[in-house]
């Protein structure tokens, strides 16, 4: 059985972001430069690029708080000047982060309404949309990236926030199926859809009934997806997830010179079980996803997932080699001091991928 071509895409050299304005179409869809050596080793970005986002990311130059507050006045209550004279929020305060997200989604991506229940995971928008920009590059494989309503994507574990499906449609016009094991999460995402006409008819929701399955029970016989995406549960237990969240809050407080303390808001993990942890953690979740992907090889062009722990890549490569996949790529992303990777694999040759994509986009 031939070995898959394992490729690692280096972090891309970044250009300045486009002007802030109506968000439906990214300001720049220029083709980025990539390096693809035939090894699985991680490539280091050049000095000075370590904290950069994707060139098409609207948040590459940080947050424009005056513009965000003008678009979403509720944010004003959480914005404070820093000792350096800039404006910011307390990122250890979940209510501040939630309002920042709502402001970003309204100002840059045209969402009239976005909200999450108390205790639900509140993701950073710049990092989430970065994943989508890299997926667009992956899909177009060096060709000019463009919006395409014919592209169908599957978001595994969408959570109560639904941001991958929301951003994927608003930025690239992709059509989404979003799945989750928690019915309350899906109810909240449906509420977001119902309050945003631009999302209606473009996002459909499916509940995963089996807590040990990923694609099984979600992908139907008539489905064809150009992309699947996922942010797997990171931790292996609720205790581990709670400790990780508290550690993050304490680090934020220490960075501001404050005495570390836990609040009731930061200790509320009730709605986050499926979002933050599962039995076996990220490693087991990825193993299940890879194993199940073989059964849906003819229905999905690219399978992808975030991988937070670098040590989990090696067993993934080994499992993919055993399945005989055609291509494996690893794309490194970095936001601030956090490094994560996109693992992508396809059972189809490059020629077949090109034919598939072109037929979908042309409507053939």
Curated annotation (Swiss-Prot):
<dbReference type="GO" id="GO:0005737">
    <property type="term" value="C:cytoplasm"/>
</dbReference>
<keyword id="KW-0698">rRNA processing</keyword>
<feature type="compositionally biased region" description="Polar residues">
    <location>
        <begin position="25"/>
        <end position="38"/>
    </location>
</feature>
<protein>
    <recommendedName>
        <fullName>Ribosomal RNA large subunit methyltransferase F</fullName>
        <ecNumber>2.1.1.181</ecNumber>
    </recommendedName>
</protein>
<feature type="region of interest" description="Disordered">
    <location>
        <begin position="1"/>
        <end position="52"/>
    </location>
</feature>
<dbReference type="InterPro" id="IPR016909">
    <property type="entry name" value="rRNA_lsu_MeTfrase_F"/>
</dbReference>
<keyword id="KW-0949">S-adenosyl-L-methionine</keyword>
<keyword id="KW-0808">Transferase</keyword>
<comment type="function">
    <text>Specifically methylates the adenine in position 1618 of 23S rRNA.</text>
</comment>
<dbReference type="InterPro" id="IPR029063">
    <property type="entry name" value="SAM-dependent_MTases_sf"/>
</dbReference>
<dbReference type="GO" id="GO:0052907">
    <property type="term" value="F:23S rRNA (adenine(1618)-N(6))-methyltransferase activity"/>
</dbReference>
<dbReference type="GO" id="GO:0070475">
    <property type="term" value="P:rRNA base methylation"/>
</dbReference>
<dbReference type="Pfam" id="PF05971">
    <property type="entry name" value="Methyltransf_10"/>
</dbReference>
<dbReference type="InterPro" id="IPR010286">
    <property type="entry name" value="METTL16/RlmF"/>
</dbReference>
<keyword id="KW-0963">Cytoplasm</keyword>
<keyword id="KW-0489">Methyltransferase</keyword>
<comment type="similarity">
    <text>Belongs to the methyltransferase superfamily. METTL16/RlmF family.</text>
</comment>
């Amino acid at each position: 059985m031939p070995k898959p071509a394992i490729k690692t895409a280096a972090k891309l050299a970044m250009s300045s972001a486009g002007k802030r304005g109506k968000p439906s179409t990214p300001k720049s869809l220029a083709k980025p430069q990539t390096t693809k050596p035939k090894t699985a080793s991680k490539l280091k970005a050049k000095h000075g690029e370590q904290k950069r986002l994707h060139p098409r990311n609207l948040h590459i130059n940080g947050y424009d708080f005056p513009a965000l507050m003008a678009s979403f006045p509720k944010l004003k209550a959480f914005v404070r000047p820093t000792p350096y004279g800039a404006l910011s929020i307390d990122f250890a305060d979940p209510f501040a982060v939630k309002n920042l997200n709502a402001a970003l989604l309204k100002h840059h991506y045209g969402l009239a309404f976005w909200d999450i229940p108390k205790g639900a995971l509140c993701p950073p928008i710049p990092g989430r949309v970065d994943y989508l920009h890299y997926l667009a590059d992956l899909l177009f494989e060096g060709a000019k990236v463009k919006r395409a309503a014919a592209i169908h994507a599957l978001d595994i574990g969408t959570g109560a926030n639904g941001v991958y499906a929301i951003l994927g449609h608003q930025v690239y016009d992709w059509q989404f199926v979003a799945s989750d094991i928690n019915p309350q999460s899906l109810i909240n995402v449906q509420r977001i859809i119902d309050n945003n006409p631009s999302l209606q008819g473009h996002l459909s929701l499916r509940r995963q009934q089996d807590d040990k399955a990923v694609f099984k029970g979600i992908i139907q016989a008539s489905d064809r997806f150009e992309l699947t995406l996922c942010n797997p549960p990171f931790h292996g237990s609720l205790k581990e997830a709670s400790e990780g969240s508290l550690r993050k809050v304490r680090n934020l407080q220490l960075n501001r010179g404050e005495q570390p303390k836990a609040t009731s808001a930061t200790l509320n993990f009730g709605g986050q079980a499926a979002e933050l942890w599962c039995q076996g953690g990220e490693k087991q979740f990825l193993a299940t996803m890879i194993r199940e992907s073989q059964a849906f090889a003819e229905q999905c062009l690219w399978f992808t997932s975030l991988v937070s722990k670098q040590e989990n890549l090696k067993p993934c490569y080994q499992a993919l080699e055993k399945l005989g996949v055609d291509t494996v790529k690893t794309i490194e992303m970095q936001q601030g001091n956090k490094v994560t990777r996109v693992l992508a694999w396809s059972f189809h040759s490059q020629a077949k991928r090109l034919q598939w994509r072109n037929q979908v986009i042309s409507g053939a």
